[in-house]
Amino acid sequence: MSLINTSLFSGLISLFIFSAPVAAFLDIESDEETEYEIDADEEKLPWAHDLLAESRQAACHGQPLVVMFGSATCPYCSVVRSLYMIPLMSDERYPGIISRELDIDSDQMVRDFSGKRVPMSALAAKHGVTLVPQVMVFGPDGKQAGEPLIGISNEDFYGFYLDQAINSGIEMVQSAGKSSSGAPNVSPGAYACD
């Protein structure tokens, strides 16, 4: 009986000795949640201040307004912000596009599409945003183009889905600039373009 106890004890000691380096390498013992590392010097996505003015400024260039609803506690928001939203502002396919961010937990005031000043959190609630990140594309009248992009379930296709949403927004901007006969009825001056 003592031979069994001795070999069981030796086996457990060996298992512990050899598995400790593997566990340390794999960080199995860590109590910390996995976080995406974001460069401290990362560019910032501008906060929305006046959605009506920002959407009209984008429309001056034939582009929609792209808004990311996020929160400070959302690690996936950092991924969407750094990999998609910030690069979007300099994407040559969308000259003049404007992308902004709203914090769903913030009481910071922002002007909505009707010109009324509301807290960012109230604006998020008005648009039914409860999960973040959530990206929405808007035309110059504040109408949402297509479906929102909620979360980031598949990074391989996220850019494709974002492009689809933006293209729907571009179509909305272009159709807002035409009468029912198809003739242009809105000039860039109608949006107070610079």
Q: Where are the regions that the model predicts?
A:
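Structural recognition of the beta-strand scaffold that forms the well-ordered cores
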Residues: 66-68, 98-101, 137
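Solvent-exposed loop/turn segments at secondary-structure junctions
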Residues: 72-76, 84, 104-109, 142-143, ...
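Non-catalytic, surface beta->alpha helical segment in thiol-disulfide oxidoreductase systems
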Residues: 126, 130-131, 136-171
